[in-house]
Amino acid sequence: MSTQVLPTRAKIVVIGGGVGGTSVAYHLAKFGEKDVVLLDRSDLTSGSTFHSAGLVGQLRADPTLTKMNMYSVELYRELEKSETPASWRECGSIKIASSNERMAEIRRQIGWAKTFGLDLVEISNDQIKDLFPLINLDGVVGGCYMASDGQVDPSSLTGALAAGARRGGVKIFTHTRVLAINTKDNRIASVTTDKGEIQCEIVINCGGMFAAEIGRLVDVRIPIIPMSHQYLITENFIPDEVKFLPSLRDPDNLIYFRQEVKGLVMGGYERNSKPFTASANSFDQIPADFNSKLLPDEWDRFEEIAENAAKRVPVMGEVGLKNFINGPEGFTPDNEFCLGETSVGGFYVAAGFCAHGIAGAGGIGKVVAEWVIAGEPTMDLWHMDIKRFSDAYKSPKFTLERVKENYEAYYDIHYPGEERSSARGENKSPIYDWHKENGAVFGEKAAWERVNYYLKATEKDLDQSLQPNGWVGKHWSAAVALEHHATRNSAGLFDESSFAKIKVGGARAGEFLNLICANNVVKGVDKTTYTQVLNKKGGIVSDYTITQVADSEFLIITGTAFLNHDKGWLEKQMRENNFDQVEISDITKELACFGIWGPNARKILQKVTDFDLSNQAFGFMNSKMIKIKDISLRATRITYVGELGWELYIPVKDGLSVWLALLDAGRDLGIRPCGYRAIESLRLEKGYRAWAGEI
């Protein structure tokens, strides 16, 4: 039953009464937050939750997500003993390999599972048949089994979480539509509903497939696309004497199964995916009355899945069909959750569960509640942080292209160094065309085209003898070794124009940066400092270099993918610490950035400038304005590869001229254009760490 009288004030308002919203509310109450209101536009579970398939698998490629899913299982066991059980069934799960490559992946996953204490074991075909007697083993190479995986009824789970939240003091209002979210000084101030206004400090957007619409109320782009996801339920046919079946996944055939009463649920991830939208001009807008509804059946898109299912479980071609479900699920561009505080202070999101929100719901609720209470993540959630998305994802069309590709690759084997092919070419270096004409093999990061390495026409027959076998060697190239050795022995020239560049200025800029940075960064004009940025517990939020370019102006250089994360953290600290005389701006696209490193770097650079580059005149971690071909640019003596060299920051319009001048000057000194794969190899060889990887 919904609480009747809407309060005029609450500390926290949760929008969305699906499994995500109720889990967040449950955990807020569990951690002592009593002043919480949850709102839903219709009934609880009326978005995507009610039609979710209910599978709960724990092991994922991401360690953080694995830990979150493991917590979910612990929570569901606990809820099953409560006054309102969650209908949790610990039936186990099987994954089978229908190819040798998949079997190799399964064996890798068994190794990963051991690091978490998970009971994932390899099983033979006979054991698979014993556990799942309905299976046809044709083409099956082997499989694995995890006894502690299971399934849960999504509506019962949501009900159990909502009941627990209410017992903890949370007030829940259904059939209450949010009309506006109001801000003051870029912070949450109140929520306006069709039943009145609630003054509040924090809003948590748990709107699921509606999350993008809710985000637009505060002009925040949330890159979630509702995708049609289909599955069927058979009539009852499993004899009573058959033990309850574990769930079964056959990713090579794109299908999954679980038992439903005495029948089967069967679904999958088709190669011809389709978004759900209110109109042809919008990719993330849901009809206003789409509550507790499904989409029309699209059997033609499901046909391949059904055929694969009948081959793997032949009875699927014989039994009757009880129900066919086509329900929209919110997907993100990388199939990871979308969590955390946005660019608006106090406006959080917990959505985009990519059809595995039931498995993750317990963990999602826990980490988001902790994040809200602490004001920062309590564990490494970078891969789920909404700030991981670049500004390119403000385009629904760009987002859709990437969502479709990742949806259709959901069950694929993923290899180190693989690249996405969709939504390419959004951001390019000013010398992109030169790279392309000279054999560059491009990768993409945060919607930037970047050179991975070069394959020159004269080097097609590279030495492949060192290529690793199997999974690791899929995207390996001998060209990286050539670039690596050129940098160590002569000089490498790198285009790092995608690096994020943030200008911090104002009367209190130095004071502000010294507050949030672990190192003193106010060392005088033209001094550069490498520093970590710490949270209240001393954890590393980010790391970057800061160059003082004037008395009250600083240039921050950080990773390509970290612009919104790092700029967002700066803005949050400025807001919370009342530094109103500080200005923060993104100047990434104003400057090209080239790195020239190696034993011959000084000789090459000195040939094109009159400025003294000697060690005495231009020491390490110093920065100066110099000229190359009458072009003024900033040169910073720094290295990310462990060799002598400089990073050069050049007005974009002059980028090609400087690049060509350096190549020409270094022709007789062994200079070689190099890509990001060489940077990775070089930095790791020297023990240089990267945030979000080794840090």
Locations of the language-model features?
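Glycine/proline-enriched, intrinsically flexible loops and inter-domain linkers
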Residues: 379-380, 386-695
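Helical element adjacent to the flavin cofactor pocket in flavoenzyme catalytic cores
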Residues: 144-202, 210
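Beta1/beta-strand and adjacent pyrophosphate-binding region of the FAD-binding site
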Residues: 6-20, 37
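Dinucleotide-binding Rossmann-like beta1-alpha1 core, especially the glycine-rich loop
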Residues: 54-131, 252-257, 261-265, 275, ...
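C-terminal catalytic lobe of FAD-dependent flavoproteins
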Residues: 154, 261, 279, 292-427
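Glycine-rich FAD pyrophosphate-binding loop
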Residues: 29-49
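Short beta-strand to alpha-helix junction loop
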Residues: 67, 96-105, 144-166, 173, ...
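Flavin-dependent oxidoreductases
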Residues: 23, 57, 181-283, 287-296, ...
